[in-house]
Amino acid sequence: MKILIILLVFLNLITNINCAVCSSRLQVSDIKFANTHVLPIEGKSWKNNTVTLKILPNRESLLLAKFQDQTLSYTVKVWVDDSLMGKLTLNDPSKLPPTESNGTKYSTVHHSIRIPKDWMKPKMKIQFSTMLLKSEFFFPNIGHETNLNMWLLPFYLFGANDTNTQPLSVTGSISKDVSDELIQKWSLSSLNALNHPISRIDWSYLILPAGRNNLPGLRITNSDQKRDGYEIMSVVLGILSGIRGANGEGPSSVLYYAPLIHLGANGKYADPWGGLGGGSVGTGDYSYTGIFIHEAGHSYGLPHAGDSYKSGNYPYVDGSLLGSEWGFDMNHNEFLSVNIPSNIGAYKNCNKSFILDQNKNCVKQSVMQGGAGNQAQGYRYSMFADYEEVTIQNYFKDSIIYDKSFSTGYKKWNTTTLKYETYTPSTKSNGLYGINDGLPIERNVDVYTIIITHSFVGPANLSQIYPIFKSKGNLMPFFDPTNSTQLVDIRPNVSKYAWYCHANGCDYTIKITYTDGTTKYMLLQRGKRSWFSPSGAIGSGFTDPLSGESSLSVIFNIKADKTPSKIELFETLLGFNGFNSTTATLLVSQSF
């Protein structure tokens, strides 16, 4: 009887303890995820700003969490869409990864564990537990998935070749080590950097258009003939943009970079001494180091951080990283401090030229503000600020992605369902910006890429066709001005694509003659009119040798199922009315 009473008392005690445990929650604080930067679980926002830097999906990430009792063992369970992905045991604070260059530890109080990339998805939730307690559920603010394709297309100019400069094996691709480090610096899910199908551009001359610094057009044969340090680079950017457009890559997550390899008047390699970037294209030297990552930043739409700070559009003083979150490199398994490492060249006398934090330590500059060279030993690149990663993260958010596994061949991110969904291309704004979202009508076929320049004021050597390229590429839709049935669709204001010629007219036609005697006509969505005046007056700039309007550049692809024998560019004013051989003016003609 006494034994029974004692047993009942013991069971009652255990029940009370269990009830107390069941009614309490494991307390967790300061939950962070580290991939490109170390971010709070809700992401990072800025005062008086509507943007948020979100945690990256499909990227292995370091989870950090702080608990009241650091001596206990903790686990974390991860769900995605309420499906359990798995359970992991966190490492205690002593096992937190180190800081670059043996710098100050990021934390001495955080448990941590790497979360597999397949678990890092929107609609993710996590729960921590010990043997007796469980935490509430936490919901990381996961962003959209961006998989970047980067085309590398070297320009060998003025006699530069593999022997007197650098071979294509160096200029036309980046190593896996470089690619692996780049992805650690960019808020992307993946990076695919490849040599462009064209492979390389080899030209003995370059046409500089009129208008830059109020100068006339010029044909040059060495880099010393440029009239300012960025003139050649500016032309290269225009060509890259044209090739990107000719392949229908404008709506997609595609960047271009052109290593610029050219010879000077002495016949020797001439360093470009800088770079230029913007609008998803960039150019610079061939080394794929500081200039490359800086110009890639411009390609994403990032300005110089110092100028942006002065205009109130960058939160950290003078383009520095003072206030930015630390970075983290999964490949090196170490934190990246915002302070300049003490064992690199930039550290010496840095207090004379760099921003100092409250402890008088020198603070790194952003990659977009002279930050090249601030990286620790063993790294190729320094850091972007967390604030700049928002621009990188959002740059391709509205991209239309080609994916054969979707019924239409395209997908687009849905910000409501937080996943990619089937997208059906359509023509917006009555065709003002092209047909079917500016996407190709054929992909990955043999094409010729044709690049034409013309000057309306001369000299004659500015009007020419560069050597054509044959490669794999995409084809864009064109209307045939000799086909009245097709022209019905682009009559201004009254047709299916009523604004197709409203940007600045449709005043030029390409004629391709093939070796078999057949011909092809293509009306260009380009003209000599002002905005929204497809039949309006022609501007005066076309006869001004110092105006950019007096120079014309046309870049397009044609299918390489037949061999062209002649390519011609005609001025066909009001081309939406048709091609009239008696009134058409031949601008450029070249036989092959």
UniProtKB/Swiss-Prot annotation:
Cited InterPro entries: Dictomallein, Peptidase_M66_dom
Main location class: secreted
GO cellular component, one term: extracellular region
Subcellular location as annotated: Secreted
Record's keyword terms, sorted: Hydrolase, Metal-binding, Metalloprotease, Protease, Secreted, Signal, Zinc
Protease as UniProt keyword: yes
Cofactor binding remark: Binds 1 zinc ion per subunit.
Keyword match Protease: yes
Binding site for Zn(2+): 294, 298, 304
Family: Belongs to the dictomallein family.
The protein, known as: Dictomallein-1
Biological source species: Dictyostelium discoideum (Social amoeba)
Organism ancestry: Eukaryota, Amoebozoa, Evosea, Eumycetozoa, Dictyostelia
Gene name per UniProt: dtmlA
